[in-house]
Amino acid sequence: MQTMELGRTGEQVSQLALGAMLMGTSTGEDEAFAILDRYLDAGGSFVDTANCYAWWTGPGNTGGESEEVLGRWLTSRRGKVFLATKGSAWVDDPARFRDQPGEPRYSGAAGETLRRELDASLRRLGTDHVDLYYVHVDDLATPLEETLEALAGLVAAGKVRHLGWSNVRTWRLERIRALCERHGWPAPVAVQQQHSYLRPRPGANTRSIVDDEQLHHLRHNPELTLVAYSPLLKGGYGDPARRAHPVMNEYRGEDAEARFAVVADLATQLGVTPNQVVLAWLLHQTSPTAVTLIGPRTLPQFEEALSALELKLTGEQLTYLDSAGA
């Protein structure tokens, strides 16, 4: 498994990161451990979670389940893992929001909130620090200065090594960079956004999705590494029935249909799955380079994704994929 530098930190991380979102809820502990062990055996080291994972998966789940499972697994493995978690998207009353449309009320990125949430995450994870800590959902209600000063304090305290941001617009990233430079605070080295082979439709809400503006920003700011989440768009590439999922709302249209068709055609030509074609395409990207974050629910899903590492696309095949669209 290849590694890449995280920003300009000198830190080498796996280009294929393992998301633990469903571990402890939809994925039972035994299967979660099997996936994690297999990932380590394959040479991976970058494991991603969040304090809110995964309250929405069913009654009785309140958040923190993923971190708790990881904490038990990490007992004898902490030194082998680059560990990322997130704060600011905790939900105090998940039962109220689980079946309601729209976005729940998140805890936010106030200084005291982040300090409290990180301490709780460290307890669940059974460690004294995380390697990467994200603001999970950008908080427009809290002054950025307050959030950034609190994050700087967490780094100074040795509880966090590197910082990141997620679900954030490009203008905010630039504002964050400028404030960090002005005050001497540690700046984010990673931005975790939804990114896949499909392109957002015209007029899409791209707060959480990499759009052309953000691609341009990332190409010109190599100190910030893209971590691409939901690369498979909830299984829509391989299963047309999955294209009814709300994740597709910002992609639907003729361009998406044309790209789905090209992925299916190339997968047939190569004797692989559409998911593997998409992951291989992402892993071949160089402008910008990105960490591809997968979140398998089962061990077979993980094995399918892992096999994409062996799929080497030719220049002609990459051009075929890149030129597709309406």
Report residues per predicted region:
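N-terminal binding-site loop/beta-alpha segment at the start of enzyme catalytic domains
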Residues: 1-82, 156, 232-234
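Structural preference for beta-strand elements that scaffold enzyme active sites
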Residues: 5, 13-17, 45-46, 80-84, ...
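Conserved, mostly hydrophobic/aromatic
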Residues: 6, 18, 32, 47, ...
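N-terminal small/glycine-rich loop or linker at the start of catalytic domains
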Residues: 7-26, 84-105, 129, 134
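Short, acidic/polar
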Residues: 27-39, 107-125, 174-178
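Aromatic/hydrophobic pocket-lining residues that form the small-molecule binding cavity
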Residues: 32, 66, 114, 118, ...
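Beta/alpha (TIM)-barrel catalytic core signal, keyed to glycine-rich beta->alpha loops juxtaposed to Asp/Glu
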Residues: 55, 142-326
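Surface-exposed, active-site-proximal loop segments in enzymatic domains
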Residues: 58-64, 91-108, 241-244
